[in-house]
Amino acid sequence: MQPVKMTGKMSFSENVNLSGDCTGDYVTCQASIEDLSIKAINSRKISVKAIVTLKLICESLQDIQMITGVDETENTDIQQLKEELEFVQLAVNQRDNFRIRENVSLPAGKPEIQEIIWDDVDVRNLNTRLADDGLKLAGDLDIFVMYIGNGETGNVQWYETTASFEGSLDISGCNADMIPYVNFQIIGKTVEERPDLDGENRDIAVEVVLDMDVKAYEERKKDVIADIYSPSYDMEIENADTQLRCLVVRNNVSSRVSGNLQLENYADLMQICNCTATVQLDDVTYKEGELVAEGVVSANVFYITSSDSQPLGSVHTIIPFAGTVKIAQISADELEYNIKPSIQQLSATI
C-alpha cells in the first residue's frame, strides 16, 4: 500500500475578552496547538479537531516626567537632594518578516523524488545580536522529508538533514550596546523537489518565513531630584509614584529532558525516521532567588513498520520537566519576567 498526501487549510476566528481597555495599545498574539486529532469519516472525508491556545499581550508607551533640576533665581535658597536612577528604556519596537532559503541535495544512496508526501521544518539554535546596521541572525534548519521514490516499486523513502543559515534585518535606531529581546514564529514554509544538474529530482528547495518581533532596550542613568526645600520660604511639593524597569538578569539555561515509552501496541515498529517536539510552560513560580519553570515536552515519533497494510505509524508522548533560573533576591511584587522555551536538540532511539 502506497501512502498519499492531503493538504488543506482551516480558517477560524475568535473573540477574546480582555481585562482592561486596550484601545490604541500595541497588541501581539501568540498561538499554539495544544491538541490535534485527525480521524477518517469515510473514504473521501476526514475529521480534524484542534485545541488552539491564544496568548494576547497588550503594551502601551507612556511618557514619564522626572524633575532633574530647578532653575534658581536671585535671592533664592533652594536645597536639592539628587538621586541617580538606573533603568531601561524601550528604544526599538519593530516587526518584520525574515525569509530563509536553503537548497539541500539527496545523498548518492537515495533514489530520486517522485512525490514529497510529508515534510517537517523547524528552526533550532537561533542566535541574534544587534549591530549598528540592524539585527544579525544565525541558526539551523532541521529538515525532514518523506517521499515516494522514483522507480518501479515506488517505495517510501525519507531524508533528514540540518542546514545552517545566517542573515540580517534592517532595524533603524539600534546599536550594539542595546539589549535585544526577539520573538519569532514560523508563519509560512514551502518544501519542493527540484531537478539537479543532471535533470533528476534530487534537490530539495526549502523556504521558511519567520515573523520577527524585535524589541531593543537601552540602559539609561538619570539624576533626578529626590527631595527639595528652601529655608527662606515654604514650598508645596507634589509627589507621584511611578514604575521604571531595570534588567536583573538575562540568561540562557539548558535542561536535559528524557523519558521512556513502552510500545506494547506497536509491535511492528521497525525503524524510527523522525521525531518532533514542542515545549509548553504550565507554571512559573519565584522563590528564594530563583525562578522555577514547570511544564511538559510534547513529542511525536514517526516510524516505519514491518506491516504491508500499515507501513507508517506514529506515537505521541508527554514528558514533564522542571527547570530553574538563578536571579538576584527581589520582591515578587516587583518582578516581571519573560521566559521563551524552545527545543535545541532532539533525538529518539529504540
Residue spans of the language-model regions?
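C-terminal beta-sandwich interaction modules and adjacent acidic
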Residues: 1-350
